[in-house]
């Protein structure tokens, strides 16, 4: 009997990953990141989530989003909402935790392992829910920074924690290459379209 293939899905909190890598002095090479986890099993899906503002110009982030979309990532974006709090201060709301959680729960019956690129403690409930469904959860964040960027309750709940510093040699962008754009900026040209995802073609692009 042939060994069972480990089916993996990546769930990337775009801004969280960008901030974590930058705090350690490097930028992510998303091609290398994809290749690294393809080597660990059958990579069924790689989700990338980022909130966007309606008034930001698309040109500043277009290269990154376009590249992700055409190279095996499922890009999910949501427009941020501005509001005024009780003190009269203008604030921006753009949390994508729910979108990530829903996608993970829906995909749970089809995967063996979830790799979560985030240190947000709010994901503890999601991690528990995935584990109850028989999915092994790996959290990738930073514990070596001061202060640590991963919530300790999330780190403890995960089946495995990987400090992103240990992955730097495998997923960091060559400093001589053109730097990646900051994922907080978003393209207004992004359309709600879907195409089949595979290792050489594009992924799924969604705007919420």
Segments the model singles out, each with a brief description of its role:
Residues 1-208:
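Terminal and domain-boundary accessory regions
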């Amino acid at each position: 009997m042939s060994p069972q293939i480990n089916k993996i899905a990546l769930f990337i909190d775009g801004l969280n990953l960008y901030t974590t890598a930058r705090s350690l002095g490097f930028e992510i090479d998303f091609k290398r990141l994809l290749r690294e986890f393809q080597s660990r099993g059958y990579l069924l899906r790689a989700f990338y989530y980022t909130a966007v503002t309606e008034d930001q110009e698309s040109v500043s982030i277009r290269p990154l989003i376009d590249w992700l979309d055409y190279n095996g990532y499922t890009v999910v974006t949501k427009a941020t909402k501005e509001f005024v709090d009780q003190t009269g201060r203008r604030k921006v709301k753009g949390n994508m935790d729910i979108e990530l959680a829903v996608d993970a729960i829906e995909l749970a019956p089809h995967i063996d392992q979830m790799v979560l690129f985030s240190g947000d403690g709010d994901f503890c409930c999601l991690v528990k829910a995935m584990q109850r469904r028989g999915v092994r959860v790996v959290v990738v964040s930073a514990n070596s920074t001061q202060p640590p960027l991963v919530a300790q309750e999330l780190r403890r709940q995960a089946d495995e924690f990987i400090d992103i510093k240990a992955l730097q040699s495998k997923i960091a962008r060559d400093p001589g290459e053109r730097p990646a754009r900051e994922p907080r900026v978003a393209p207004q040209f992004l359309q709600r379209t879907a195409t089949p995802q595979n290792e050489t073609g594009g992924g799924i692009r969604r705007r919420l």
